């Protein structure tokens, strides 16, 4: 009998997703392949998706509306959408209020990992309900599976 492998549930912060999507040949290209191949399942909420959509419009990326749609189509279908309740769970104090939706998503979605490069979020590692790790650390974990 073959053991069923559980898909790793992961919250990816916006900058991690942007790096994987916009820089297709960059250092986070393996992360994009991981969600496309079903090695991990990104979790999203309406708030985190809205932030990603807003970030894709930043002038520095020089992406047309069509390119933005293509990048979203390369990510969102692989994600599980988590509904954050009207009374969201308490999160640890966080300096940046824009980080709170990612912490809430990790809690409500019962994520295995929150993947980020944000030093404010990384400073909560070891004190939060799920592991908070860098993209590099996450890729190492995926490679071990």
Where are these regions (language model features)?
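Short, well-structured N-terminal submotif of metal-dependent ribonuclease cores
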Residues: 1-44
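A secondary-structure boundary/capping signal
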Residues: 12-14, 45, 117-118, 134-135
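Short, active-site-adjacent cap segments at secondary-structure transitions
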Residues: 17-18, 50-51, 121-123
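Residues at secondary-structure transition points
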Residues: 26, 43, 66, 93, ...
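Hydrophobic/aromatic ligand-binding patch that stacks against planar heteroaromatic rings
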Residues: 34, 105, 124
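PIN-domain endoribonuclease scaffold, especially VapC-family toxins
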Residues: 34-89
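Active-site neighborhoods of divalent-metal-dependent phosphate/nucleic-acid chemistry enzymes
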Residues: 78-113
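Acidic, PIN/NYN-like endoribonuclease modules and their adjacent C-terminal/linker elements
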Residues: 92, 109-113, 119-145
